[in-house]
Amino acid sequence: MNISKHITYAEAIKSQQAIRMRLSNEPTPEHLDNMKYLAENIFEPLRKHFKKPIAVTSFYRSELVNRAIGGSLASQHLQGEAMDIDAQVFGGLTNAEVFEWIKANLNYDQLIWENGTVTEPDWVHVSLTRRRANRKQNLRMFNNKYYTL
């Protein structure tokens, strides 16, 4: 089963921590709907624009998995509303390009430049919700501290 044209269900729920600890990482039907909404409205427009593969490094997280990795209790990954992407995995595209394109062209709740340098994040976190108005909040995270852009 696919979440969208370019994201498989297995890819969307994959977690190394869940595998190592034998934890369930299965979304509820509501969370699955949120995942599909995020994929169709953020990831697929990215793929269409750049015409290159982009790796999803973290998508859905169950409460057990989120707790095991020390994730925030308010993480939108828990609702299937957030994904971490890394354009550098396949080459030919930078995370900075992805960040700036999302910022300029898409509706989103949070867009986070995760670690890295001032010119290139290690990965990009992006979220989208249907529960309320999206904030279009732009942040940078360095050394576990968040800074508003």
Name each model-derived stretch.
Residues 1-47, 140-149:
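Extracytoplasmic cell-surface/polysaccharide-interacting catalytic and binding patches
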Residues 43-69:
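Extended, low-complexity, intrinsically disordered C-terminal regulatory tails
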Residues 55-57, 82-86, 125-127:
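Structural recognition of the beta-strand scaffold that forms the well-ordered cores
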Residues 63-83:
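Short, surface-exposed glycine/acidic/tryptophan-bearing loops
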Residues 87-149:
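Catalytic cores and adjacent binding grooves of peptidoglycan-active enzymes
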